[in-house]
């Protein structure tokens, strides 16, 4: 049987995600971000709610990406997620993209010329942002041009890099309907961005979300809910360079900007430069909020939920892969658990995220 991997955030889960799961074959394993997202923001609803949405709509097994995999630039996000899925035995990776290309060929190219390609990136001027450097590399070696704003295409290339040299086939699915950042309501498939923006419009949600009741009942948060705490974390820290990935230049810019910024959005605007993109700045702010330090990634994989089919698969992995299904006295990943505690502060009605929680079980799909 085919074992298909899907890397996702489901922020929140919508019809486009359901379409992706419907297109996937065999046993479907989702490696999902926890409570903080790749582009450096808190999830609109918590990881358990999003895992349940996925399991109700075709996923067989949902596992959690640790905080320091979830909140990363595309390449590191892709690498960390593929590492986890590879250990869970996937033989194909399905993903949505704005531009369906021969990603398998791109992965083979990276297998062959990866060292040369990375050297090319290292030699590019530091005035370029990391995404600009990566795009220059793909243009040089694969003749790829980047048109407009296509974050899923960028992630797809990160997945191609991550599967290079592994026995995993890539299966791109053409993204349906609205673009990633689109807030347009007049489409067949709405984007997660639009759903977050129109979260109080019930008709809109019912049109585009399969598990709308779960979403409506869940406690929700936005970045601004954490601004007072973020401000405190910045002002009370005498040396921000002790925080993961914060260099001297960024530390100075953030300390200066917090004096006048009245919101997270304003802070991001003030700190962003040509070299430091908004997404990168948001990630740095997420690290500061969660007091992230350089950390070893957990060996064990945290299981958020499964169907009967998923449970059988986990059983077959016993002894080969270290799995955590209940976080108790023994921590799974201290960094992720700390981030979860901070996430809960954004809305006091958010349920406990780790202790006493057990995987969600869905009997039928």
Swiss-Prot record:
Class in the EC hierarchy, top level: ligase
One record GO biological process: tRNA modification
UniProtKB keywords: ATP-binding, Cytoplasm, Ligase, Nucleotide-binding, RNA-binding, tRNA processing, tRNA-binding
NCBIfam families: PRK13670.1 (NF010191)
EC number: 6.3.4.-
Organism: Streptococcus pneumoniae (strain ATCC 700669 / Spain 23F-1)
GO molecular function: ATP binding; ligase activity, forming carbon-nitrogen bonds; tRNA binding
SUPFAM superfamilies hit by this protein: Nucleotidylyl transferase
Protein name, UniProt field: tRNA(Met) cytidine acetate ligase
Subcellular localization(s) per the UniProt record: Cytoplasm
List of residues binding ATP: 7-20, 96, 152, 175
């Amino acid at each position: 049987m085919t074992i298909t991997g899907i890397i996702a955030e489901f922020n929140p889960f919508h019809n486009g995600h359901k379409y992706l799961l419907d297109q996937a074959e065999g046993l479907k394993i989702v490696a999902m971000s926890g409570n903080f997202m790749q582009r450096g923001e808190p999830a609109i609803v918590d990881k358990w709610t999003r895992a349940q949405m996925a399991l109700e709509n075709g996923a067989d097994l949902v596992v959690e990406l640790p905080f320091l995999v979830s909140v990363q630039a595309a390449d590191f996000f892709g690498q960390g997620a593929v590492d986890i899925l590879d250990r869970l035995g996937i033989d194909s990776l399905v993903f949505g993209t704005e531009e369906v290309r021969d990603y398998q060929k791109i992965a083979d190219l990276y297998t062959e010329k990866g060292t040369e390609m990375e050297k090319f990136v290292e030699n590019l001027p530091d005035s370029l942002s990391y995404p600009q450097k990566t795009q220059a590399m793909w243009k040089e070696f694969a003749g790829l041009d980047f048109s407009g704003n296509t974050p899923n295409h960028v992630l797809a290339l990160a997945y191609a890099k991550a599967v290079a040299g592994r026995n995993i086939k890539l299966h791109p699915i053409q993204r349906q309907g609205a673009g990633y950042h689109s807030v347009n309501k007049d489409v067949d498939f709405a984007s997660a961005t639009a759903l977050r923006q129109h979260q109080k419009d019930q008709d809109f949600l019912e049109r585009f979300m399969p598990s709308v009741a779960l979403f409506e009942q869940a406690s929700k948060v936005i970045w601004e809910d954490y601004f007072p705490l973020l401000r405190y974390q910045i002002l009370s820290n005498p040396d921000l360079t002790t925080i993961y990935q914060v260099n001297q230049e960024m530390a100075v810019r953030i300390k200066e900007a917090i004096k006048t910024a009245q919101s997270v959005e304003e802070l991001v605007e003030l700190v962003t430069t040509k070299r430091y993109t908004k997404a990168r700045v948001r990630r740095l702010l997420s690290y500061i909020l969660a007091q992230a330090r350089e950390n070893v990634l957990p060996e064990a994989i945290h299981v958020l939920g499964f169907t009967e089919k998923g449970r059988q698969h986990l059983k077959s992995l016993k002894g080969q892969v270290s799995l955590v299904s209940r976080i108790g006295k023994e921590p799974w990943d201290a960094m992720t658990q700390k981030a979860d505690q901070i996430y809960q502060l954004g809305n006091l009605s958010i349920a406990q995220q780790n202790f006493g929680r057990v995987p969600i079980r869905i009997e039928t799909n």
